[in-house]
Amino acid sequence: MGKFEDDGNSESVPLTRQRSESLASQTSTDSGLSIASESFMKNHKGGNTMPTDGGDGDRYLDVEDGGETGLDEPLISSGTKTGSSSRLRKIVWLLVLLCVGGWVLSFVLFLTQKRPDTAALSSASTVEIHEPGPATGGTSHGKPVTLEQVLSGTWSPKSHAISWIAGPDGEDGLLVEQGEKQDAFLRVKDIRSSEDGVDNLETRVLMKKGYIWFDGEAMLSAKTWPSPDMNRVLVMTDIQSNWRHSYFGKYWILDVATQKAEPLDPGNLSGRVQLAAWSPTSDAVVFVRENNLYLRKLTSLEVTPITKDGDENLFYGVPDWVYEEEVFSGNTGTWWSDDGKFVAFLRTNETAVPEYPIQYFRSRPSGKQPPPGLENYPEVRQIKYPKPGSPNPIVNLQFYDVEKNEVFSFEMPEDFVDDERIIIEVVWASEGKVLIRETNRESDVVKIFVMDTKARTGKLVRSDDIAALDGGWVEPTQSTRVIPADPKNGRPHDGYVDTVIYEGYDHLAYFTPFDNPEPVMLTKGNWEVVNAPSAVDLKKGLVYFVATKEAPTQRHVYSVKLDGSDLRPLTDTSAPGFFDVSFSHGAGYGLLSYKGPAVPWQAVINTQGDEIDFINLIEENVELAKMVEESAIPTEVYSNVTIDGYTLQVLERRPPNFNPEKKYPVLFFLYGGPGSQTVDRKFTIDFQTYVASNLGYIVVTVDGRGTGFIGREARCLVRGNIGHYEAIDQIETAKIWASKSYVDESRMAVWGWSYGGYMTLKVLEQDAGETFQYGMAVAPVTDWRFYDSIYTERYMHTPEHNPSGYANASIDDVMALGHSVRFLIMHGVADDNVHLQNTLVLIDKLDLKNIDNYDMQVFPDSDHSIQFHMAHALVYERLSSWLINAFNGEWHRTANPKPQEST
C-alpha cells in the first residue's frame, strides 16, 4: 500500500505504513522540481535562535495517564498552534472576569477539582485531565472551520520546494529554486556566507521562462532536472499521469547558455517517455520509453537502445504497478554509478501475474476513441495485479556498461529463487561496487549483497532472519548511506549506515567493512529513528537523523558521530515539536521544516559549526497564523491509555466552548495500518477539525497496536492476524470515553478511509453494536485475499501458510454488523488499489443475511482517492451530512419504517 505519505489529508492516504516521508537530502537529480519556491524572505543572524511559536497556550493540553506521563508527553502546558497574541488574550479574559467574575470563579473551582473518569474496563488506564486554568474551551472566539476551507486547502501550510545540488567542483550549499520571477524561472543560489571563508558563486539562472520553444511552439514545463554541471536542464512537458507515482511525458534538453531546447530523442518526437535521468558526469541521459531502456549521449543526436524486448509484460528501468506502490513508492528502477560508467536497472517480468480489469464508464484514460459501434461500452484497462498467493513479478537486477555498450548480469551466492525475491534497494558504492538489499516473499528475511561490476562477482555480506528475531517483518526502505573509505579520517574501509532492529526498536548501525557482522551502534534506547539516516557529513564524520527520542508523537533532528558518540539534538527538544529536514550535498546546510504543533515554518540552516545557525527564514505562514487567531479552533488533548500492558497514544479534539457539563457525541477517526501513525504533533486542520469546530462533536483518535513508533513488540503483535488487536484497542478506548461525564454514549461513531475503512468495519464487526452505533467506511478492504501480495503477505504471510488468519481478518460476521444502528460504505469504481471487488463481495454477504442497515455510494471512474468529477468534495459532504443525521437520531427512525395513514 505504499509509504505513508502525509499530505495533510491523512484520511485519504491509501493503505500505507508510516515513514514520515522525510525530505531527506533531495538533490536536483532525485526528483523533478514542480512546485514554485520564492526567494528567501528574512535573514536571521544570532546563532541557534529558533523562530518563536507565539500564541496562547490553551489550544491543546497534555494529559496525565495513570502516572505514566514519562512514557510520552511531559505533564506541562505545551506549545501552541494558534499563534495569537497573548496580550490580546489577557485583555479578553480581563473583560470576561469583570462581566461574569462570580460565575468564572465558581467554574474555575469546579475545573480545578480532579474528576477521574473510571474506565469501563480494568485493563485500560484511568485518565485524569489536568486543565491549565479556565481556558478549557480553547480558542472559542472566531468563526468555525468550514468544510469548504478544509477541502480547498485554505488551511494547508505553505511550504517551499527546494532541491540541493553540488557545484561543478563539488561545492556545498547550493540550492535550486523554481518560481515565477521575471526571467528567472529556475535558478541556482549559493547560500554560503562570506563568514564561512568561501567565495560565493553568483546566482545562476538555468531557465528563464517556465516554458520552452521548439519549432515555433511554446510548451509549458511540468518538471525540470538540472544537469550536475548546471550547463543543461532536462525539461518534461505534456505530463500524463499513470499510477500513483508514475507518469509519461515529452522530454527536452535545454541549453542554459542559449536557452534553446532540443528533443531528448530527435528521432522520435511523439514518443512518451516514462523516466529520464542525467549521468553524474552530465554527458548522457538514460531514459525509458515503452518499457525499454535507451541512452542518449550529448555528443550525438542518436540514441542507443540498451534493451529491445520490453513490452506490456516486460519492464526495464521502471517498476510495475506493485513495485511502484509497495516497494519504491516511486517511478524509478534505474540507478547510475557515481562515475557514470555503469547503469543498474531492474528487469521486471510479470508475464505470469494475473490481470485485474478496471472499468471506466464516463472517461477514456487511454485517450483512444472506440471503434464505430462500440461507443457505448466502457473502457477496460487490464492491470497486472498480484493478489496473495498468486504469482509475483520476477525481478532481476541487470547492468549496462556505458563504454562497452554491453548489458550483463551475474549470479549472487545464496540469493533467493526468482519467485521468492523482492529487490527493495540498490545503492552504488565506490569503484564499481553496488549494495543490493533483498527480502523473501513474506518480507521476514533480509539479505544484503555487495556486487562488483568490474570483477562481475557478488557476495552475501549480511542476512537477518526477522521472523526468528521478533516474529515481525522488514519494511522496504531506501535510506542506506554508503560511507567511503578515508584512512586519513580514521575510515580504512568502505562501509554503510543502515537502520537495524536493536533491542526491540529501529536504530542506526554503521557496518564497516561491508562484510563486518558486528556494526557500531550509533543509536540505542526505547525510541526509534525515522527514515534514517537523513544525511552524512563525511568531513566531520557526523550522521544526521530524525527520531522519536522525546516522544512517539514528536520528531526532532539529531546528529551522532560515526563512532556512536556525542549524540545531540539540532532542534529545541524542550517543547513538543515535529520537524523534518533535507540536507545539502555535503550536509553542511539544510532546509529545516517545523511542522507543528504551532503554525509551521521553514528555515535554511548552517550545520557546519558546533550548533546550527539560522541563515534564512523562508516561510512563516503569517496568513495562516492570522486565520488561526480569527477562527474557533478545537482544543487538542493529548493523552495515552494502557491496554493489555501496551501504552497507546490518544488525541481528543474538543469543540470550542467545550462545556464539561454537557453530553457530546463522539466520532472516532482511525487509520491503524501496520507501522502507521495518526496521533502526532503536527499542525493539522482537517476534516476532524471541521467536525469538532463546526459540528460541535468530540473527535478521538487512538494509535493502537500494530501502528508505528512505539516499539516492535507492539507493532509485530498483529502479524498474521491484522484487524484483531487493532479493533480491540479502538473498542476499549471507546468504552473509556463512553464512561466520561461529558460524553453521550448513545451517540458514538467511527470512520476511516482505505485501511481506516477496513478498520471501521472490523470495529463494527467485533463490537456488534455494544459501543459504537455508527460507522463510515471509505474504500475499505473487506477480504485481504483481494489486496496485493507484497503488502498483504508482509503482514499476513501467504494464504497457504496462514489460511485461518486470512479468514479471521476478513469482514465476514455480517450479523454482527447488523447490530449497529447504521453504517455507510463509499468506494471508487475505478479503484486500482483497493478494488471495488471488496465492497461488492461484502454487499453480497449482507444481502444473503438480509442485513439492510447500511447506505452505499459508488463513484464512477474514481480511483482510490475518489477525485473524478470533483467527487472528493462529495465524499466529505456526504460524510458530514450522514454523520449529522446519525447523531440527530434520523437513522433510528428509518430502522423500522411504518406507513403513514392517508389523510
UniProtKB/Swiss-Prot annotation:
Membrane spanning residue stretches: 91-111
Residue ranges, annotated region (Disordered): 1-83, 121-143
Superkingdom of the organism of origin: Eukaryota
Location (main, coarse): membrane
Stretches assigned to the Vacuolar side: 112-903
A single BP term in Gene Ontology: antibiotic biosynthetic process
Active-site positions on this chain: 754 (charge relay system), 831 (charge relay system), 864 (charge relay system)
Protein keywords: Aminopeptidase, Glycoprotein, Hydrolase, Membrane, Protease, Serine protease, Signal-anchor, Transmembrane, Transmembrane helix, Vacuole
InterPro entries in the cross-refs: AB_hydrolase_fold (IPR029058), Peptidase_S9_cat (IPR001375), Peptidase_S9B_N (IPR002469), Serine_Prot_S9B/DPPIV (IPR050278)
One Pfam assignment: DPPIV_N
SUPFAM superfamilies: alpha/beta-Hydrolases, DPP6 N-terminal domain-like
Gene Ontology MF terms: aminopeptidase activity; dipeptidyl-peptidase activity; serine-type peptidase activity
Membrane topology according to the record: Single-pass type II membrane protein
UniProt GO cellular component terms: plasma membrane; vacuolar membrane
Similarity comment: Belongs to the peptidase S9B family.
Protein role: Type IV dipeptidyl-peptidase which removes N-terminal dipeptides sequentially from polypeptides having unsubstituted N-termini provided that the penultimate residue is proline.
Protein name per the record: Probable dipeptidyl-aminopeptidase B
Source organism of the structure: Penicillium rubens (strain ATCC 28089 / DSM 1075 / NRRL 1951 / Wisconsin 54-1255)
Organism ancestry: Eukaryota, Fungi, Dikarya, Ascomycota, Pezizomycotina
